[in-house]
Amino acid sequence: MPTPALFNLIGNTPLVPVTRLDTGLCQLFLKLESQNPGGSIKDRIGLSIIEAAEADGRLQPGGTIIEATAGNTGLGLALVGRLKGYRVLLVVPDKMSTEKVLHLKALGAEVRTTRSDVGKGHPEYYQDYAARLARELPGAFFADQFNNPANPLAHETTTGPEIWEQTGHELDAIVVGVGSSGTLTGLTRYFRQAAPNVEFVLADPQGSILTEYVDTGRVSDTSGSWAVEGIGEDFIPAIADMTGVRKAYTISDQESFDSARALLRAEGILGGSSTGTLLAAALKYCREQTTPKRVVTFVCDTGTRYLSKVYNDGWMHDQGLLQRPPLHDLRDLIGRRFDAGEVVSVAPGDTLLTAFNRMRSTDLAQLPVIENGKLVGIIDESDLLLKVDNHAEQFSSLVGTTMTSRLETLHPSANVQALRSTLDRGLTAVVAEGDTFYGLITRFDLLNHLRRTLS
C-alpha cells in the first residue's frame, strides 16, 4: 500500500518564542506539537509503533491494534492505523475529555471506557484492561506504549534532532512531562550524544509520584489524583530514563489550567491541559535562573480537545478551579450566576422547540424564563414532555403557556438545610431577593459544594 501523504506531515513542527509572558532572564521557546495532523506529539509514536510492528511481523494485514491511552496516543494510532486499514480498539480512563473520545470514534476507532480511580494491577486499570483484551482477541497487536522501544525511538530520531537544529545548537534546558516517558527517554538519549550539558526539567502534576522519585530516588506506593490529562504517573514506566532530569516541579491542576488559559490570552496559542503543566514549570524554572538560558518546552496537544473543560468557566467552577469572591450565602452554591451572564434562559415568547434545543445543547434539565430582566417562571423537561407527548406540533407552542410561574424562592441568606428541603420535595431551588434573580441551584451544584467543602 502506498504511504499516505498525511504521514509526511507528522513532525517538523514549529518552534516559537514566548514573547508576552515573564520568562525572567531566559528565552523560552514552545515546540508546537499541536500542529501535527492528529493534533498532538503522540502522532510521532503512533507512526513509529505501527511501522515497527509491521516490520517485525507483530502486526499483520487485517489485524487489530489495541492500546491503553489517555487519548492522544490513541488518536495517533487511530489516525495511522485506520489509514493503513487496521481495526483500532482503545481503552481510555473515564476522566478523558469528551472531545477526545468523540474524535477517536470519528476516526473509526472503537473505544472502551474504564475507571480512573484504580491503580496498576487492578483489572479495571486501563493498561491492565487493554493487555487483557489483547490476550483474548485473535490477531491483536498490543501497542503497549509504556514498554514499547519504538516510543522513545520516535523522539530520539525526530523530535530531538528537530529541536537541536531549530535552536541553532544553542540550548540549555528542556522542560518535559512524563506519561509513558517516551518523550523524555528519547530526548535524553539524543542529547546525551549531541549536547550532554542540556538539562532536563520535569513538569509533574500534583498527585503523581514522579517528582518524589526524582528528588529522593524512592518510588512511592501512594499517589493522588489529578485532572490534567496525559502526564503524571503512579508507577515508573519500564522504558523511562530519568537520569538526565536535574529538577522537578510539582504543578497543581489550578496552576496548569490557569497557565493554559494565560498562554492563549497572552500568546494566542491554544494548548491542552498538560501544556499548562509544562508551561507553569518552565516559567518557574526560567524565573529562578540567575544567568540567561535558552529553554524549550512543548505545546503537547491542541486545546480544542479541552474546550468543555479547561476553557469552560462553568466546568472550572464546578471543579473548584475558578474562584469567585465568596459571598458566604447560598449564592456561593449557584453553578451559573444570572448576574454574571452565565445563565442559559428562554423568554415567555420563545417556542418550546427553542427551549428544548437550549436544554439539549447545554445538557440542562430546566431553564429559567426571563422577561425584561426578571424571572417569571421555570420550564423543565417534564413540562415539555407533558405538552408534546404524542403531539409533536405542540413544539411550536410558547414557553409562557407551559412554564411553571408559581415559584418557591430561597433568600440568599437561607441555610443549606432549607435548600435540601426544597430539592427533596422535587422543586427547583430558585435563589432570589425581591425582584433580583441570582440563579438556580441543582442537586449537582449542591454535590459540587459538598465536594469542595470536604476537599
Per-region residue spans from a language model:
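PLP-dependent amino-acid enzyme catalytic core
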Residues: 1-333
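Short glycine/proline-centered loop/turn elements that form peptide/ligand docking sites
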Residues: 95-98, 342-343, 352
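Glycine-rich acetyl-CoA-binding "A-motif" of GNAT/NAT acetyltransferases
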Residues: 375-378, 416, 437-440
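Bateman (tandem CBS) regulatory domains
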Residues: 244, 327-343, 395-407
